[in-house]
């Protein structure tokens, strides 16, 4: 069935930028912009080789890209002697990937008991763990304390809570919420005043004084004011805010500020036309603020921490899927063996993820499709009105930038089973780093019930 409503300029632009498929109505490309390329890190031949061992759908990670990116980050902040990246485990909780990041000098940012368990199993402990939680259960706080992790308190009342359920360590971090609206230039980035996280400055002062009275010797400051910023200015701007706060807190309490944690928020260019963040420029911007604000106050020993998740892994992950069906009705639909249970972001946020049809990277993008999964929900769509090459049943499709908040946000709605995870190693070989769920996994929590014997017969 022929596609309708395709302008010549949309086809032409796709030809000029091989592999580009993002001519959605309203996109810069469809308005006459020349998009940048966004290429997969595997070829069709590589994908087919992996599929022989691991059926689609599966999440695939690029070890080479992950390591190179971690090294660029560490280089960008090498001017700060205490610098450390604490990878946000929530983004991609896989021990094989955590070990790669550990080998590149990273710690882990945990927010739950199970994330702490996973990190401990990977060999992280002490100052290699930052525990940032909210509405925190007692067992989680105790686990973090027992691991000697840096504990980041979200609320003033957590000072007493920490003392009651665990104890008071020598170093404690407190999370700051400035309230109001956070803007960059004329753009409103987020609304901290509506956020459930953190303490006001007045509460920070009170928390520091209480903690000092209980024996705390070193303090950290943490804040998260915006998510997925594609701007080299966010971290330097946040650093300026937190460095000035550090000076004020030091003067108000006499506390030794050991570190400032810039948390996450540095994003990735999900769309081909978006400019990528330059981490070297970002690091230099933070250094400028450091030298202008902290050094003159005699606070040049403050360490800089980051808690990047998306920036560390998103571009180095693909969701690899096979085309199962085509449907021709009022629109043209391509049905994949992956669904929102494998990648929630498009359905949950309306988020854009680039799509490449492997083996057709240089074909004209002259067909308009909705690319869907098989959930019984109409928002189970990876792309709407997306310009792509002609797609056939059996084609292998790569959904880009799924290395963070991809597998980790998966779920079992409709009885869907979570997919496997595979590592593309530096030498080009591949390794299974998480097997796919089975029906036995899905029904395991009924193993106590009278229904279990009949279920077990079907495995």
Name the predicted role of every residue range.
Residues 291, 299-459:
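Charged (often Lys/Glu-rich) extended helix/loop segments that serve as interaction or gating elements
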Residues 32, 178-324:
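Active-site loop/helix belt of alpha/beta enzymes
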Residues 93-96, 118, 137, 160, ...:
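Flexible loop/turn segments at secondary-structure boundaries
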Residues 167-181:
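Glycine-rich, aromatic-flanked loop segments that form ligand/cofactor-binding clefts
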Residues 66, 90, 112, 144, ...:
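Conserved, mostly hydrophobic/aromatic
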């Amino acid at each position: 069935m022929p596609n309708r409503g395709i302008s010549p300029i949309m086809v032409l632009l796709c030809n000029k930028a091989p592999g580009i498929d993002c001519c959605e109505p309203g996109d810069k490309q469809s308005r006459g912009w020349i998009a940048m390329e966004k290429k997969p890190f595997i070829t069709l031949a590589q994908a087919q080789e992996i599929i022989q061992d691991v059926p689609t759908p599966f999440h695939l990670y690029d070890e080479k890209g992950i390591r190179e990116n971690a090294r660029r980050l560490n280089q960008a902040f090498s001017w700060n002697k205490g610098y450390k990246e604490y990878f946000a485990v929530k983004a991609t909780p896989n021990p094989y990937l955590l070990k790669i990041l550990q080998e590149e000098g990273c710690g882990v940012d945990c927010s739950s008991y199970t994330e702490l368990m996973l990190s401990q199993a990977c060999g992280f402990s002490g100052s290699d763990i930052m525990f940032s939680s909210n509405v925190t259960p007692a067992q989680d706080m105790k686990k973090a304390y027992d691991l000697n992790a840096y504990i980041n308190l979200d609320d003033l009342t957590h000072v007493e809570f920490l003392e009651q359920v665990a104890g008071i360590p020598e170093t404690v971090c407190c999370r700051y919420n400035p309230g109001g609206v956070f803007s960059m230039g004329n753009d409103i980035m987020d609304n901290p005043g509506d956020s459930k996280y953190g303490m006001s400055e007045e509460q920070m002062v009170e928390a520091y004084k209480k903690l000092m009275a209980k024996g705390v010797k070193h303090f950290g400051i943490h804040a998260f004011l915006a998510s997925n910023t594609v701007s080299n200015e966010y971290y330097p701007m946040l650093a300026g805010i937190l460095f000035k706060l550090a000076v004020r807190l030091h003067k108000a309490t006499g506390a030794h500020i050991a570190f400032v944690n810039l948390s996450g928020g540095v994003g990735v260019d999900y769309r081909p036309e978006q400019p990528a963040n330059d981490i070297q420029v970002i690091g230099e911007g933070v250094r400028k603020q450091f030298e202008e604000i902290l050094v003159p106050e005699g606070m040049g020993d403050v360490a800089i921490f980051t808690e990047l998740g998306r920036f560390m892994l998103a571009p180095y992950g693909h969701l690899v899927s096979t085309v199962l069906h085509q449907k021709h009705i009022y629109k043209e639909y391509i049905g994949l063996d992956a669904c929102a249970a494998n990648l929630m972001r498009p359905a949950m946020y309306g988020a854009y993820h680039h799509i490449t049809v492997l083996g057709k990277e240089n074909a004209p993008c002259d067909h308009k499709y909705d690319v869907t999964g098989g959930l019984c929900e109409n928002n189970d769509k990876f792309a709407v009105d997306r310009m792509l090459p002609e797609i056939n049943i059996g084609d292998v499709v790569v959904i880009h930038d799924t290395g963070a908040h991809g597998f980790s946000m998966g779920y079992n709605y409709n009885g869907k089973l979570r997919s496997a995870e595979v590592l593309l190693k530096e030498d080009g070989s591949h390794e299974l780093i998480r097997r796919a769920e089975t029906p036995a996994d899905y029904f395991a929590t009924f193993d106590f019930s009278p229904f279990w014997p009949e279920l077990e017969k079907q495995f």
